[in-house]
């Protein structure tokens, strides 16, 4: 099993980078976690619907250039399914038993993800009804991936 994250934009905050690196390190004995950043689009001062669509399509194209046919694509979106940590771990385990071995999580930029990219995803996943900065979402996702692996392996971490 391998986890991939394709995310729009670069993280500048050192505390987020350190947290993500810590969970990547913790995951190494179990699985790989590859994080790929794609360039975010420059947002115009006034966002009209046409400009929003243009930005979303630009970012969609950059994301798609990093995907492969082997990817089981899970797009993070506020409209997605919500799980408990245990249910999320069970979903990952069940999909693995079905033969899925590469999970690719997509995190959009400031404007989220295009509708067409969300439709093409195998699953839409929401961590909360709250809106989080996309940079922080990477840290939350990597922690939940580590938690899911520990649950799957029946090892202490999640209580």
From Swiss-Prot:
InterPro entries: Alpha/beta_knot_MTases (IPR029028), RlmH-like (IPR003742), tRNA_m1G_MTases_N (IPR029026). Pfam families: SPOUT_MTase (PF02590). Its EC number is 2.1.1.177. Keywords: Cytoplasm, Methyltransferase, rRNA processing, S-adenosyl-L-methionine, Transferase. S-adenosyl-L-methionine binds at residues 76, 108. GO terms for cellular component: cytoplasm. NCBIfam families: PRK00103.1-3. This is Ribosomal RNA large subunit methyltransferase H. The gene is rlmH.
């Amino acid at each position: 099993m391998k986890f991939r994250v394709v995310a729009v934009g670069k993280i500048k905050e050192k505390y987020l980078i350190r947290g993500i690196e810590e969970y990547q390190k913790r995951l190494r004995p179990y699985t790989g976690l590859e994080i790929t950043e794609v360039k975010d689009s420059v947002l115009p001062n006034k966002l009209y619907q046409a400009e929003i669509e243009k930005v979303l399509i630009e970012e969609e194209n950059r994301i798609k250039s990093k995907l492969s046919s082997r990817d089981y694509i899970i797009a993070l979106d506020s409209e997605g399914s919500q799980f408990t940590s245990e249910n999320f771990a069970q979903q990952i385990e069940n999909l693995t038993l079905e033969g899925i071995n590469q999970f690719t999580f997509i995190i959009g930029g400031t404007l989220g993800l295009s509708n067409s990219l969300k439709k093409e995803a195998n699953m839409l996943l929401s961590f909360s009804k709250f809106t989080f900065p996309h940079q922080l979402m990477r840290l939350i996702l990597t922690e939940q991936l580590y938690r899911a692996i520990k649950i799957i392996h029946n090892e202490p971490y999640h209580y």
